Amino acid sequence: MANWISSKLKAAETILQQLDQQAADSLRKDEKSETHDEVFETSPKSGSSPVSLKDQLRKKTYEGSDSGSGSQRNSTEQKPSYLSSSKKVRKPDQSHERTSAPSQSLTQDNTKLTDNDWTELLSTPNQRTSTSTSRSPGGTSAIRGLKKDGKRHGNLGKNPLVSDGKKSSSSNVVNSRGRPQKQTNKEPSDKEVSSPSDADMKNRNAPRDIFVNSTHKESEKDVSGKTPPLDDSRRSANETLPRETSPSVGKRDGRESRRSSVWGKQVREEVSQSNVSDGLTRKESSLSSDESESDYESDSSTDSERERQREERRRRRERVFAEKVATKAVAVIKERENMVARLEGEKLSLEKIVEERAKQQAQEAAELQTNMMETLEAADLEKQKHNNTRMEVLTRLAGLEAENAELTRSLAAGQKKLETQIDQVAVLKQQVELKESTLEELKRNTFNIGGRGTTLKQLDTSRGDKFEHQMLEAEISLLTDKIGRLQDKATKLEADIEMMRKELEEPTEVEIELKRRLNQLTDHLIQKQSQVEALSSEKATILFRIEAVSRLIEENKGMSATEASSQDLEAGDWELSGSKFKPAFQDKIRSGKKHLGWLVMQLNAIFISGTVFLRRNPTAKIWAVVYLVCLHLWVLYILLSHSDASSSGELRSGAVISLENFSNSSLQ
């Protein structure tokens, strides 16, 4: 988006510059049009224009002048019939009868227009514009040839060359000799010859009528101040007319071919028209020289009145035309100013959009930074929770291991007791077996003892043996009971041992839950770490984009500051603002700021990681404090020792130098 806005700003600036250049060029052209060289350069261009406003106004003056003298009007309308056939030239009466009707139609069409009707003059039909356009090529070429001959040969004056130069301006000298008859007859012939090219160039040469009118005015002033010469000079001027128009056309072609190829095409068309018109003027001059001598004496009385009327009309026309040109120029200038103001408004709106986008990007960057901080804090909290749960699990595992060790110890002690009791039972069984063997021996002895005298004794002994036997049986029963109880205890201990083994081999529900919780926390931690990495990458990309956008904005500001210029539309002056070295200096400052900011960011990251590490490890805090204290003490020691050594060295060197100087002076 920033690139699009910058491209739009550049396009608007280029359009403004083009408009300013066009306005300055138009003003320069208006200033240069007052000189004679620009007049003669632009007059041939307007010669081939199909619709000339000045020619239309002149056509109206012809009709006004012809209304005063009907014979001259009829004679001016003879030329189209003359060009249609060479036989009708010798019979002016017949041509007059045939051409009276078209002359009346032309006068009726022209009388409908007024001097102040600008739109009707532009919307006139092609038949009238072609006749008016045929006057301008010959008129402009004749004016150029007239000025050159006026400088070289001062004796030519107002010959037929002057009459040819006044086809579009209707001068008084030509009318006094009756030349308007031949000139007006020449205009339809030029129309018949040059109408295809004039119709093609109708739209291309309309803007150049302003300069053509100025050239016609100057030509009328130059020609009206001279006196008519003899017929011989007129004929010589008619003969020299094509010779003088051709180099003028060559000059014009040479000048305009250097400007553009379009002007070259127009010049070639004008040359073709001028060649045709030159051929016609030669024929007309040879035929009209005889008739002009007869008409000159009859029209000499009305010359002064016609001159005054035509001068008044010409002045009035010039005044109206100048006012129209001025209003048109003011309208063009206003349009250009409005366009410039509109483009400036668009430029300001685009700048506002750029500023708003920059603000939005800054806000987004701030929001992203806050989100990053929040996510980092959440990740730290999750890490702390994970560490806490891990410590709890470790403590529980340590307790379970201690309980397991105690149980194994108690199992080993019970097994030892069981073994000792089993040994005791075995010993008691052996004793019981010995007693039983002794009892059987005693029984056999009692059966073997004979005699009744001894029976009592035997009975007493048997009774004692029985009593002992009972005692032994009681002891045996007690021992068997103890053995049963011990066996029960052994079975219970074995069952407990098996349960403990099962518990050790198979984890309990609590341990399973703890392991599941631990796995969930590790997965959550991995996800958080991936999110943190993604956010860090997004942050890096956003920072890169922010730097790029800021760089573009600064470059656009620098370009606008360096390329900002103010142009005076009336004078065409440019005033450039800014300096050439300012952007380079700003670029250096910007690069230095970027490097410094990068270093500060790196140091900040290092310090943040160090603070996090020290916050989690209290022993590291103590060692860091001790290291900093030792480092400061070492730096102070180095500084103090270096200052003492440098001061003592300076004193020693000064003392040695003074002793050497003293010894040298004493030796001398």
From Swiss-Prot:
InterPro entries: Golgin_subfamily_A_member_5 (IPR019177). Residues 26-39, 184-207, 215-237, 250-259, 303-312 have a biased composition (Basic and acidic residues). Residues 64-86, 100-113 have a biased composition (Polar residues). Its main location: Golgi. Residues 123-141, 168-178 have a biased composition (Low complexity). It is found in: Golgi apparatus membrane. GO terms for cellular component: Golgi apparatus; Golgi membrane. Residues 22-317 are annotated as: Disordered. Residues 331-539 form a coiled coil. The chain crosses the membrane at residues 594-614, 622-642. The keyword Signal does not apply. Signal peptide: none annotated. It is a multi-pass membrane protein. Residues 290-302 have a biased composition (Acidic residues). GO terms for biological process: Golgi organization. Pfam families: Golgin_A5. The C-terminal domain (508-668) is necessary and sufficient for Golgi targeting. Golgi matrix protein playing a role in tethering of vesicles to Golgi membranes and in maintaining the overall structure of the Golgi apparatus. This is Golgin candidate 2. It comes from Arabidopsis thaliana. The gene is GC2.
